[in-house]
């Protein structure tokens, strides 16, 4: 390759007699994934120019020229008129080239004073992540809202609740749907907590030791929407725990979506028959005409593994790096950008899928008592009559054994069979051997009784609204 000067898409060159080999450049180039930082490069460069002016390193005229050039560069990036060239090493070199093209090397070449790619990229990446996770949070609230809307539409529907994937106790369908909304809300809580650590600006840290040019990192941090400037320049330029934490939060969100997806996949099978998928959110088979496949749910389940891989790969990259900056850290962006991209595909698709599900509530109600799911109610009825739970548990289990041997439900046992198990099992026990009674009786906070589930839904809706407001507010107002 020809001489690789600092005005040709790279930010270094004077110390070298020639440019890198083709293989070296191919390994080093990063514009194919770091170009997402270009709009943030403009914002940070404008803030940096103002600080250079305050430090009397830029004249009034040069500042005005530079800001105008950066504004034009930002517009050209936004509308696609300016982009990276094959000779650009990274987004930073490309953007400097673009600025110099617009304002000339005398003014454009002054912008780099007091900053390094090390503090620059750490700052821009944080800015991008802060915006990206707000979009993810907003999309997550929409999925929560879809679950809540289905819960409201089926407030009285009863279904089999399961543990170990076996029949356990009857619950409200709304209760089950809101049980998927809760972890999604916690995922947004994690995003908001993560943002506290993202909101620290590395700008002004230089390569690792800070700057001798009397710059003002706090002013840049404030203009860019950060809460503070970094306390330690070595840490600020070389740490990527914010990236691995982001990867974890996004992977956890994907895992929570995958659990919902798994239930949808099971529920739409003929064996369950709980739901029917909308044609708009399912696919067919190339050979079997009857098929209606839950591809949205399956892709959600599959892509969750991809996000877990992004997390583990990033952790492996970070685990043994000495201080301060190392080029390994170029590998921090692709896994995060990919995880964000996958969630931006999955969230609207899962929201559409959930909001258009048709529930077969009669089928769910029919199966709710199957598997002797009222056995606990029988035992707790005995407890209310003063029987120790250990004895009540034994008696209820004996009733299940008899009913199972006869192929009937608990309520179908005769009075003689009940009293034969335990004389304290009087005919009045039949009052609790209904799925409606079982559901209504579980009225503790968080329980499946209708009144409690309505309270849960109200809290879910309030939390979702608050999270959406936070996400829409943005970082830089």
UniProtKB/Swiss-Prot annotation:
Pathway: Amino-acid biosynthesis; L-arginine biosynthesis; L-arginine from L-ornithine and carbamoyl phosphate: step 3/3
Single GO term (MF): argininosuccinate lyase activity
UniProt keyword annotations, A-Z: Amino-acid biosynthesis, Arginine biosynthesis, Cytoplasm, Lyase
Name of the top EC class for this enzyme: lyase
Top-rank lineage group of the source organism: Bacteria
Pfam family, one: Lyase_1
The enzyme's E.C. designation: 4.3.2.1
Compartments it resides in: Cytoplasm
Family per similarity comment: Belongs to the lyase 1 family. Argininosuccinate lyase subfamily.
The protein's name: Argininosuccinate lyase
Organism expressing this protein natively: Corynebacterium glutamicum (strain R)
